A protein has these predicted regions:
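Conserved small/polar residues in nucleotide/adenosyl-binding loops
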Residues: 286-288
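Generic recognition of stable, solvent-exposed alpha-helical segments in well-folded globular domains
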Residues: 22, 28, 32, 57, ...
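Cofactor-/ligand-binding subdomain signature composed of acidic, glycine-rich
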Residues: 1-47, 68, 76-78
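Cofactor-binding active-site loop characterized by glycine-rich and histidine/acidic residues
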Residues: 45-207, 212, 219, 223-241, ...
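Conserved phosphate-handling catalytic cores of large alpha/beta enzymes
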Residues: 224-228, 232-236, 246-278
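Active-site-proximal beta-strand/loop segments in catalytic clefts of secreted hydrolases
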Residues: 213-215, 256
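Intrinsically disordered or highly flexible coil/loop and linker segments, enriched in small
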Residues: 33-37, 71, 103, 107, ...
C-alpha cells in the first residue's frame, strides 16, 4: 500500500507493518487518554472533559497525508492527529486538563485555553516568522462550534492566491500554493449556518480544502433525524457535488473504522485537493 497519493511510494512489507503497528499504538494510547481524562474531569480534578474518542482511526490515517506546510482548522476532538504527528503527548494532554500554567508542560497555551484547543507557533521567541512550509501547522482552536469553518476558507484561499500570483517574500508561507487546509467538524455542527456559508465559499472559490465530518449519529444527545435533512450531511449537500461539466465539491463517505477504505479515501482526497484545488468533504461514519 502507498502512503502518498501524489507520488507512488513503494514501501517494503516490513515498513508497512511498522506503520500499521504504530498507528494501532497511537489509536490505543489516545483512547486510553480519553477514558482517563474524562474520569479526572468527572471527579472534579480537571477542566473540560471532551476528548477524541471514536475519531482516532480516521485521524491517524489523515496524518499520513498531512504534509509540511499544510494547516488544520479543527476543534477539540483532534488530539489523535497531533499525537500521530508527534506534536502532542499524553502527558501534555493531562497538563492541559489540569490547567498547568507553565508552557514547558502545557505547550499549547500554558493553561490559558480550554483543554483540547491545539496550536503550533508561527513566530519564534524573537517575533520572527517561522518557516511554515517546513512544519505541520495547526491554527489555534476556538470554542464556538463550527467557527473553525470560516478560518478554513481563509487558509485555503491563501494557498490559491499563492499559486496564482507571484508574491515576493512568500518563501516561508507557501510552496507555490501546494498546501491543503484540513478541516474537522462534528456532524451536529454541520447544522449551523456558518458551515453552509463556508461550504458554499469553498465551492465557489475552489480552494484546496479537505473537511472531515465525524458522524456519530448523534450530536450530543440529539439524533441526526432531528437536526440534519435526510439524516446525512453528504446527502443534504448533494447539490454541491462536482460533475463532469460543472465545478463543485467532491463528497465522499467512508466507514470510520475501516482502515483500508480510509487510506484509499484520504489518498484520493489529498491528491485532487493538493494538485487540482478541488474542495473535498469526507463524511466519516463513526457509528456504523
Amino acid at each position: 500500500m502507498s502512503i502518498s497519493s501524489s507520488t507512488k511510494e513503494e514501501i517494503s512489507l516490513k515498513k508497512f507493518k511498522e506503520k500499521v503497528i504504530n498507528d494501532f499504538r497511537t489509536v490505543s494510547l489516545s483512547r486510553e487518554v480519553s477514558i482517563q481524562g474524562r474520569r479526572e474531569v468527572l471527579l472534579g480534578k480537571g477542566k473540560f472533559g471532551i476528548f477524541g474518542d471514536g475519531k482516532e482511526l480516521p485521524q491517524v490515517v489523515m496524518s499520513h497525508f498531512f504534509k509540511d506546510g499544510d494547516y488544520r482548522s479543527g476543534y477539540y476532538r483532534d488530539q489523535t492527529l497531533l499525537m500521530s504527528q508527534n506534536l502532542l503527548s499524553a502527558r501534555e494532554i493531562f497538563a492541559a486538563v489540569y490547567g498547568h500554567p507553565d508552557k514547558l508542560y502545557e505547550k499549547m497555551s500554558g493553561g490559558r485555553q480550554m483543554a483540547g484547543h491545539f496550536l503550533t507557533n508561527t513566530i519564534d521567541e524573537n517575533n520572527n516568522w517561522i518557516d511554515q512550509t517546513s512544519q505541520k501547522n495547526h491554527i489555534s482552536d476556538i470554542s464556538p462550534t463550527a467557527s473553525q469553518m470560516s478560518r478554513l476558507v481563509g487558509l485555503g484561499l491563501a494557498s490559491k492566491i499563492y499559486r496564482n500570483n507571484s508574491i515576493n517574500g512568500s518563501e516561508k508561507f507557501s510552496k507555490n500554493g501546494n498546501e491543503v487546509v484540513w478541516g474537522t467538524i462534528g456532524n451536529a455542527s454541520t447544522s449551523q449556518g456558518i458551515f453552509f456559508e463556508a461550504i458554499n465559499a469553498c465551492g465557489v472559490l475552489q480552494i484546496p480544502s479537505i473537511i472531515s465530518v465525524w458522524d456519530d449519529d448523534y450530536g450530543i444527545s440529539v439524533h441526526n433525524k432531528d437536526h440534519t435533512t435526510k439524516e446525512s450531511i453528504s446527502k443534504a449537500l448533494a447539490g454541491f457535488k462536482i460533475t463532469s461539466d460543472s465545478p463543485g465539491i467532491e463528497i465522499l463517505e467512508v466507514k470510520g473504522w475501516d482502515y483500508q477504505s480510509l487510506m484509499k479515501t484520504y489518498s484520493y482526497a489529498e491528491k485532487i485537493a493538493r494538485e487540482h484545488h478541488i474542495p473535498v468533504i469526507i463524511l466519516s461514519l463513526i457509528h456504523i
